[in-house]
């Protein structure tokens, strides 16, 4: 791969939860060392890998640039890694920015004007791009040109500028937040799914080899099933368990060492951490299992409503612990059982009976 330019890219907001799928402060360099360098090294997402291989090989055989590519899915599944792999597979240079960094059309115009033929432009969080920049992007994606407005008011003129043929790779955790015109301009869209435990075991084995960690097979399985289906979380937990093994044991990670370490870091057997359990406990013990509004629930655990709704709730819903209903959040029978409590009679996997009547 040629030059790598991350002009305009922004760091993730700090998040000190070990089970957060977002990058934590200072984690970028370590995360980069574990990134796969080719589609052959990329673990998981078999359908996406196959589809991407066809798109890229077809473009190389034709001697042209591939269609613009949209990668969607939850954070931590490898969208940035795939963008880097796409550039590497095409033997192209990669330019990296993010939606929030493109506040004005001029910001995008400056970046597009520096592209050379065949470059890959990666825009992370593309759903957060400002509207003026997005509208300029339409023309660049379709016709490889942009119209730059010079001057203001009635005397303003539009100057067309040619843009070198390039491939845009957009990444989003909220594909529904993309406008229709932007979404329609991507020739290929790939949705990335959460990983199965067996796939995460392979991710952990590869990472352990790169980091020189002695990881037992059963220990890898233990970490994998607590990683919330997310490779980034799996790699983070691996490093935390390594710390424990080196400080309190002989450095070899066995299943017992992994369990003991994850207990210290408050990550339980399903991957729930202290905040997740606090939300469930408040929902059940303070509100009888619900229904209760997210704002009220957030006050009960001393967090902002957005933290509960965007950080905790997605995994709790996916794990079958919380149900969203028109009347509020409801604890399922699994949530009661997970906290060691007996569900009330009549409660189901979707919460209390009668909520949808």
Curated annotation (Swiss-Prot):
GO terms for biological process: DNA recombination; DNA repair. GO terms for cellular component: cytoplasm; Holliday junction resolvase complex. It catalyses: ATP + H2O = ADP + phosphate + H(+). ATP binds at residues 34-35, 76, 79-81, 142-144, 185, 195, 232. Mg(2+) binds at residue 80. InterPro entries: AAA+_ATPase, AAA_lid_4, DNA_helicase_Holl-junc_RuvB, P-loop_NTPase, RuvB-like_N, RuvB_C, WH-like_DNA-bd_sf, WH_DNA-bd_sf. DNA binds at residues 324, 329. Its main location: cytoplasm. Residues 1-27 are annotated as: Disordered. Residues 1-195 are annotated as: Large ATPase domain (RuvB-L). Pfam families: AAA_lid_4, RuvB_C, RuvB_N. This is Holliday junction branch migration complex subunit RuvB. It comes from Mycobacterium sp. (strain KMS). The lineage of its organism: Bacteria, Bacillati, Actinomycetota, Actinomycetes, Mycobacteriales. The gene is ruvB.
